Structure formats: structure tokens, C-alpha cells
């Protein structure tokens, strides 16, 4: 198996790059996260996954970031998730956020990702939870009622559960808040910065 390739980027098109490695030109499929970090003529090292299938030519998947590579491999452990679907999922969110969604059992947030419906999201949680449970987002005990109300308000505004929990936790770590309204307002500022 090819664990990685090193060479010069000669073309970027959609989610595919062409990399010149010695005398070879390799077409490598990448997530949007990896594509954003690449530029033409740049010399790069990509971690790779080689996929074989009876009904199509071999495909190489490339990752600039080890965390994304590891989450890609983790996704392949789930039933009915192939490399193309795993790449599509990783193109829609960060590896860290995906792990937090699975660990927090955020079915709603997961099912909003492209290609994932409610059943697939539930399957991901049931099959991969043990691998990511340390990433679960929890609230400090003393403010859990206010925090839960704030998360409820943020999800009603259209934010996914995991993003809402992360924003609320960040606010609570940085400063004290008087009530739910103040917490929602400050969390909204954080969420709007990341959009």
C-alpha cells in the first residue's frame, strides 16, 4: 500500500489534484480542507489511501493533515461508508468537529452533512462512538440548565447541536454570564465568526 507521496502540484481541479512524483503524474482525490492548503507548483507531501474496486480504476485519496487522514480511515470502518462518501463527509466539516458530533451523539448535526441521512448518522454513532467518546462535549455541572436552554435557543435558530454546545462552552470558559439571553448573545457572536 502507498502510505504517502511527495511531489509538485501541477493541476488542481475540483476535489482532484495532479501531483508530479518523479516521472509519474498521479491524480489524487482530496477533501476541500486539503485542497484549500494546496497551491500550484508547490512541493507537498500527502498521506494517501489507495482504493481498489472491481468496477472502477484504482483511486488515490490524499490528505495534508494527519488528523483528517486518521478520521478518514475511521469512517471507512463504518458499514456502507466507502472512500468517496468518507471524503464527501470530511469536505463538509473539520475532522475535530466530526469526531465531536459522533461523540456527542449529535444525530441532527450529522444528518445535515452531505450524503448522510438520519439512519446513516445513527449508524455512524453506534459503530464509531467507542473510537471517539473522549471528544464528547459536556457542560459544567453548575450551569447545565442555563447551558441547555442556550443550546436549545441556538439550535432553534438553525445551528447544529455540536456547534451550539462548543460555542456555549467557549463563552462559559472565557467569562461569567448573568442569564440565558446573555449566553445566547455571546455564543451567537462566536458562531457568526466561524461562518
Swiss-Prot record:
Region (Domain III): 142-195
Domain notes: Has three domains with a flexible linker between the domains II and III and assumes an 'L' shape. Domain III is highly mobile and contacts RuvB.
Protein purpose: The RuvA-RuvB-RuvC complex processes Holliday junction (HJ) DNA during genetic recombination and DNA repair, while the RuvA-RuvB complex plays an important role in the rescue of blocked DNA replication forks via replication fork reversal (RFR). RuvA specifically binds to HJ cruciform DNA, conferring on it an open structure. The RuvB hexamer acts as an ATP-dependent pump, pulling dsDNA into and through the RuvAB complex. HJ branch migration allows RuvC to scan DNA until it finds its consensus sequence, where it cleaves and resolves the cruciform DNA.
Stretches the record annotates as Domain II: 65-137
UniProt name for this protein: Holliday junction branch migration complex subunit RuvA
Record Pfam families: HHH_5 (PF14520), RuvA_C (PF07499), RuvA_N (PF01330)
Major place of residence: cytoplasm
Record organism: Kosmotoga olearia (strain ATCC BAA-1733 / DSM 21960 / TBF 19.5.1)
Region: Flexible linker, residue numbers: 137-141
Record keywords, A-Z: Cytoplasm, DNA damage, DNA recombination, DNA repair, DNA-binding
GO-annotated molecular function: ATP binding; four-way junction DNA binding; four-way junction helicase activity
Subcellular location: Cytoplasm
Entries under HAMAP family matching the protein: DNA_HJ_migration_RuvA
Region ranges (Domain I): 1-64
Complex formation: Homotetramer. Forms an RuvA(8)-RuvB(12)-Holliday junction (HJ) complex. HJ DNA is sandwiched between 2 RuvA tetramers; dsDNA enters through RuvA and exits via RuvB. An RuvB hexamer assembles on each DNA strand where it exits the tetramer. Each RuvB hexamer is contacted by two RuvA subunits (via domain III) on 2 adjacent RuvB subunits; this complex drives branch migration. In the full resolvosome a probable DNA-RuvA(4)-RuvB(12)-RuvC(2) complex forms which resolves the HJ.
GO process terms (BP): DNA recombination; DNA repair
Lineage: superkingdom: Bacteria
Ranges that cross the membrane: none
NCBIfam families: ruvA (TIGR00084)
Record bears the keyword DNA repair: yes
UniProt GO cellular component terms: cytoplasm; Holliday junction helicase complex; Holliday junction resolvase complex
InterPro entries in the record: DNA_helicase_Holl-junc_RuvA_I (IPR013849), Hlx-hairpin-Hlx_DNA-bd_motif (IPR003583), NA-bd_OB-fold (IPR012340), RuvA (IPR000085), RuvA_2-like (IPR010994), RuvA_C (IPR011114), RuvA_C_sf (IPR036267)
SMART domains linked: HhH1
Keyword Cytoplasm attributed: yes
Sequence similarity: Belongs to the RuvA family.
Amino acid at each position: 500500500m502507498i502510505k504517502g507521496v511527495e511531489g509538485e502540484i501541477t493541476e488542481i481541479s475540483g476535489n482532484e489534484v495532479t501531483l508530479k512524483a518523479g516521472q509519474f503524474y498521479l491524480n489524487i482525490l482530496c477533501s476541500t480542507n486539503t485542497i484549500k492548503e494546496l497551491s500550484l507548483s508547490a512541493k507537498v507531501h500527502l498521506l494517501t489511501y489507495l482504493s481498489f474496486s472491481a468496477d472502477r480504476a484504482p483511486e488515490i485519496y490524499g490528505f495534508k493533515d494527519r488528523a483528517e487522514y486518521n478520521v478518514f480511515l475511521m469512517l471507512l470502518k463504518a458499514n456502507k461508508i466507502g472512500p468517496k462518501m468518507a471524503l464527501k463527509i470530511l469536505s463538509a466539516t473539520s475532522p475535530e468537529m466530526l469526531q465531536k458530533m459522533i461523540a456527542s451523539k449529535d444525530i441532527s448535526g450529522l444528518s445535515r452533512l452531505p450524503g448522510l441521512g438520519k439512519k446513516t448518522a445513527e449508524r455512524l454513532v453506534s459503530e464509531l462512538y467507542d473510537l471517539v467518546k473522549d471528544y464528547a462535549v459536556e457542560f459544567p455541572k453548575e450551569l447545565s440548565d442555563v447551558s441547555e436552554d442556550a443550546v436549545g435557543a441556538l439550535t432553534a435558530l438553525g445551528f447544529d447541536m455540536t456547534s451550539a454546545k462548543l460555542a456555549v462552552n467557549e463563552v462559559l470558559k472565557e467569562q461569567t454570564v448573568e442569564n440565558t439571553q446573555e449566553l445566547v448573545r455571546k455564543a451567537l457572536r462566536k458562531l457568526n465568526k466561524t461562518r
